[in-house]
């Protein structure tokens, strides 16, 4: 169902997006953001201490873990949740980047033989890592199942499951030819009231300034703030570069918002929408 070339382009898009966001990722202070020593037209080294070992072209821990999933899938030509969890656990235990609460709690559960081992995290970022699953999903039902199985490995909360299923279905409908707004509206109708509220807030905010909107919704990691923020990005912009620049200027968990938004946005767009200099990431997809 999913064109392999386009699926790989979406993996690349999500990684480029994460690397681009690295510069202001997890910067929350408004004064710092408005005076950020970064060039928003290119990739930048990180401002935040959490990424102190990183440089321009590197990824946040979101991009690194997306790359792990891509590596696993290209090596195995399938997604097996239990097998991937073992693969992921080996990777994360020797990882030099930031290890967030969801990962730490999941590792602790694995160590203590707690099943299911996924944390109760409601962080948005896990959803932005799902693009590689398109490569091994033969139909929409398998994609939805693969997404849920993947998300639950580290983010086993009902909100994370609900939000990831919503965006998986939006991706499917975008592949079927629906516009961004039509796909969001269609899947809103079959979602719970919380997700309906997030979608409505995001779409209704499209005429407002992105910096202000994201600060108002909440720029941090949780789905409760980031969901509406990424819908705002999708509703407001018809150009990938503009969308990612304005999102990065708002700081906070910029990568979590943008990775999902860029995947959905680029399904019917040429890869040429990504500026050439942004492709200088430290990974090869192909």
Where are these regions (language model features)?
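Structured, active/binding-site neighborhoods that engage oxygen-rich ligands
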Residues: 1-286
């Amino acid at each position: 169902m999913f064109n392999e070339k386009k699926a790989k382009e979406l993996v690349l898009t999500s990684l480029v997006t994460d690397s681009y966001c690295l510069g202001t990722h997890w910067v929350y202070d408004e004064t710092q953001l408005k005076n950020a020593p970064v060039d928003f037209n290119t990739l930048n080294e990180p401002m935040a201490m959490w990424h102190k070992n990183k440089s321009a072209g590197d990824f946040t821990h979101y991009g690194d873990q997306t790359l792990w999933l891509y590596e696993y899938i290209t090596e195995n030509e399938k997604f097996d949740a239990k097998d991937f969890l073992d693969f992921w656990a080996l990777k994360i235990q020797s990882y030099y980047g930031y290890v967030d609460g969801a990962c730490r709690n999941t590792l602790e559960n694995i160590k203590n033989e707690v099943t299911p081992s996924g944390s109760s995290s409601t962080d948005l970022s896990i959803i932005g890592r799902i693009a590689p699953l398109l490569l091994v999903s033969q139909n929409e039902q398998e994609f939805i199942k693969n997404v849920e199985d993947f998300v639950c490995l580290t983010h086993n909360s009902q909100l994370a499951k609900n939000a990831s299923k919503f965006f998986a279905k939006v991706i499917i409908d975008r592949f079927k030819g629906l516009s961004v707004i039509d796909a969001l509206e269609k899947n809103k109708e079959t979602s719970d009231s919380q997700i309906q509220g997030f979608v409505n807030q995001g779409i209704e905010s499209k005429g407002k300034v992105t910096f202000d909107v994201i600060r108002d919704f909440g720029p941090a990691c949780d789905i409760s703030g980031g969901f509406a923020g990424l819908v705002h990005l999708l509703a407001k912009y018809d150009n990938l570069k503009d969308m990612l620049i304005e999102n990065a200027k708002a700081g906070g968990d910029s990568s979590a918002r943008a990775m999902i938004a860029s995947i959905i946005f680029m399904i019917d767009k040429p890869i040429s929408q990504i500026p050439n200099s942004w492709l200088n990431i430290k990974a090869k997809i192909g």
